[in-house]
C-alpha cells in the first residue's frame, strides 16, 4: 500500500475510533485491542479464544445455543470464578429453573448468590438495572431472554396476538441498561434460546434465529454460540458432552475463534480435560498410543485416567496450566506514550 493510502486509512481508522469508540474496527491480526477487566469463564480454552482472558466487565454478553447445550453451566462457572475473586454475583432466573444443588457442585457459593425469580419481563429487567446501578454487583446473569414475558402478555388471554412486544421490551431495556453497565463496570450476561425461522430455504442462510429481536445482537460486545457435538463415554456409560463454543462476535479482540471442550455431568467444564488437550496441542503433554506423559512422568493410559491423575495431583495441573497460559495467552498490549489508564 502506498504512503498516501496508508495515511488516508490511518486517518479514517482514527476518525472511526473517535466517533464510534475503541474496538469498533480492527485488523484481524491484532492480538489484544484494549486492556479490560475480565471475569474468567472457568474454561481456559475459552478464556484464550476470547483474546482477553475471560468475559469483559462493563459490557453486555450473549450466550445462545440449542437446549441442553451448556449455556447455564457456562454462566454458573463464570459466577463461581467471580466469587472466587471476591466478587458479588446475581442470577435473574426468569425460567424459574435454577437448581441450587447443581450450582453448588459447579463451585457456586449459593449462600452468597443473589437470586431473583421475577413474574414479568419488565420486572426482571428493572431488577437487573437496579442491581447494575448499585455499582456493587460484578456479574448479573439473566436466564433467559425467551422467558422475559411482557406484562401485557401475562395479563392478556392465552390466544392474544401481540407481535413484536418482547423485541420492543428488549430494545427499550438495552437502551437504558448499556450506559449504566459501562459506568458501573458490571458484566451482564443474557442467556438466549434458538428458534427456527419458517420458510428460510435460501442456500447458505441459517434458519436459526435467537429470540427477543435484534437489539441484543447490536448491544452485545461478545456473543457465544454453544452446541453439543458428541457424547463422552466411560465404557458404555455417557459421563458428559463434547461441546463446541464459537465466539460469533467480539468487540475487544478478533472474533470467530472456536474451541471444543468437555462438559461432564455434575462437574461442569472439565479443567483437567482441557489441560490434556491443550498440552498435547502445545507438545507439553506427549501422547503415545493411549498413554499420556507430562515431562518424565506417565500420567495415565486413556484420557479418563490422565484426567484422574491431574485431579489427584493438583500441583501438576497448576504447573501445566501456568505453562499453557504462558504459551497461549497474549501479553497485554504495550500502552502508547501519553495513553492514560482511564479513557
Curated annotation (Swiss-Prot):
Q: Which SUPFAM superfamilies match?
A: P-loop containing nucleoside triphosphate hydrolases, RecA protein, C-terminal domain
PROSITE patterns (alphabetical)? RECA_1 (PS00321), RECA_2 (PS50162), RECA_3 (PS50163)
The protein's predominant localisation is: cytoplasm
User: Which Pfam families does this entry report, sorted A to Z?
Assistant: RecA, RecA_C
Matching entries from InterPro entries are given as: AAA+_ATPase, DNA_recomb/repair_RecA, DNA_recomb/repair_RecA_CS, P-loop_NTPase, RecA-like_C, RecA-like_N, RecA_ATP-bd, RecA_C_sf
Sorted alphabetically, the keyword list is:
ATP-binding, Cytoplasm, DNA damage, DNA recombination, DNA repair, DNA-binding, Nucleotide-binding, SOS response
The GO terms this record gives for MF are: ATP binding; ATP hydrolysis activity; ATP-dependent DNA damage sensor activity; damaged DNA binding; single-stranded DNA binding
- Gene3D superfamilies per UniProt: P-loop containing nucleotide triphosphate hydrolases
Output one GO BP term.
SOS response
Name its cellular compartments: Cytoplasm
Residues binding ATP: 65-72
Instruction: Provide the Gene Ontology terms for cellular component.
Output: cytoplasm
**NCBIfam families attached to this UniProt entry:** tigrfam_recA
According to its UniProt entry, the function of this protein is described as: Can catalyze the hydrolysis of ATP in the presence of single-stranded DNA, the ATP-dependent uptake of single-stranded DNA by duplex DNA, and the ATP-dependent hybridization of homologous single-stranded DNAs. It interacts with LexA causing its activation and leading to its autocatalytic cleavage.
Q: Which family does it belong to?
A: Belongs to the RecA family.
This protein's name: Protein RecA
User: Lineage of the native species?
Assistant: Bacteria, Pseudomonadati, Pseudomonadota, Gammaproteobacteria, Lysobacterales
